[in-house]
Amino acid sequence: NQEGLFRGR
């Protein structure tokens, strides 16, 4: 999932 990268902030 790319959610983890999106929430990397």
Swiss-Prot record:
One of its GO terms (biological process) is adaptive immune response. It is found in: Secreted. The keyword Secreted applies. Conversion of fibrinogen to fibrin is triggered by thrombin, which cleaves fibrinopeptides A and B from alpha and beta chains, and thus exposes the N-terminal polymerization sites responsible for the formation of the soft clot. Keywords: Adaptive immunity, Blood coagulation, Coiled coil, Disulfide bond, Hemostasis, Immunity, Innate immunity, Secreted. The keyword tRNA processing does not apply. One of its GO terms (cellular component) is extracellular region. Cleaved by the protease thrombin to yield monomers which, together with fibrinogen alpha (FGA) and fibrinogen gamma (FGG), polymerize to form an insoluble fibrin matrix. Fibrin has a major function in hemostasis as one of the primary components of blood clots. In addition, functions during the early stages of wound repair to stabilize the lesion and guide cell migration during re-epithelialization. Was originally thought to be essential for platelet aggregation, based on in vitro studies using anticoagulated blood. Heterohexamer; disulfide linked. Contains 2 sets of 3 non-identical chains (alpha, beta and gamma). The 2 heterotrimers are in head to head conformation with the N-termini in a small central domain. A long coiled coil structure formed by 3 polypeptide chains connects the central nodule to the C-terminal domains (distal nodules). The long C-terminal ends of the alpha chains fold back, contributing a fourth strand to the coiled coil structure. This is Fibrinogen beta chain. The gene is FGB.
